[in-house]
């Protein structure tokens, strides 16, 4: 957001319904609420801005594509970061989530610390985590729906993929290449990054490529 403001763009970050609070609150949400909220917010912005670029990370990328397909008017670009079109959960991801859920303190040097900082839901009990099962099903439904609509994308799309992602399968990259027309797709590999942590060189690459994309839309 800071970089987009520096380039003269107005920017806003959305907090999905029942995110930013407790695990119990998150368990009560659902994908329909998330989609309706994002659609409503983008519709509100369209009243004030002629051109909008959607930027999302992880599930936020899925919602960006689905929002664009719902109402493409005035949306001139999409930036998708670590998009889970397909999932491949590595052991490292399980360890990090267990640490976030059950360790009182996580040092900054621990890879789990990046997950803790990025999480929009507070750590909770194991029973509460189990109650999230319907939300995981919601995520897979969003993944499937996004894969289905990608061939209809007809605006510039910048995709970042962390090559060491512990959650997103490399098959997601192949899906982008197979479905989005080549003239609209720009794909960037972040070779030293994970789903929540970005190496210094990758930060520089992301910063430069994102800036150029905004200015070219």
Which residue stretches match the model-derived regions?
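Acidic catalytic loop of the alpha/beta-hydrolase fold
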Residues: 164-168, 197
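Conserved alpha/beta-hydrolase
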Residues: 5-25
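Active-site nucleophile loop of the alpha/beta-hydrolase fold
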Residues: 79-89
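Gly/Ala-rich beta-loop-alpha elbow adjacent to hydrolase catalytic centers
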Residues: 56-60, 64
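Short alpha-helix in the alpha/beta-hydrolase fold that links the catalytic acid
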Residues: 1, 155, 169-178
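Short beta-strand/loop motif that positions the catalytic acidic residue
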Residues: 153, 159-161, 165
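Catalytic histidine-centered segment of alpha/beta-hydrolase-like enzymes
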Residues: 193-206
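Catalytic histidine neighborhood in serine/cysteine hydrolases
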Residues: 13, 174, 178-196
């Amino acid at each position: 957001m800071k970089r987009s403001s520096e380039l003269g763009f107005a920017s806003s970050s959305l907090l999905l319904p029942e995110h930013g609070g407790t695990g119990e609150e998150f368990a009560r949400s659902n994908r329909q609420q998330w989609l309706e909220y994002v659609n409503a917010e983008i519709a509100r912005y369209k009243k004030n801005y002629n051109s909008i670029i959607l930027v999302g990370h992880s599930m936020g990328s899925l919602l960006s594509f689905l929002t664009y397909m719902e109402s493409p008017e005035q949306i001139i670009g999409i930036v998708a970061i670590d998009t889970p079109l397909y999932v491949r959960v590595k052991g490292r991801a399980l360890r990090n989530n267990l640490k976030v859920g059950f360790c009182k303190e996580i040092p900054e040097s621990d890879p789990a610390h990046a997950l803790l900082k990025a999480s929009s839901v507070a750590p909770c009990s194991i029973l509460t985590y189990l109650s999230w099962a319907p939300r995981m099903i919601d995520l897979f439904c969003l993944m499937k729906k996004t894969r289905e609509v990608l061939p209809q994308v007809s605006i510039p799309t910048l995709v970042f993929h962390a090559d060491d992602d512990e959650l997103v399968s490399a098959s997601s990259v192949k899906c982008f290449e197979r479905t989005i027309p080549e003239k609209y797709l720009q794909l960037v590999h972040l070779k030293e990054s994970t789903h929540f942590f970005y190496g210094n060189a990758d930060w520089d690459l992301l910063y430069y490529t994102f800036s150029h994309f905004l200015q070219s839309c």
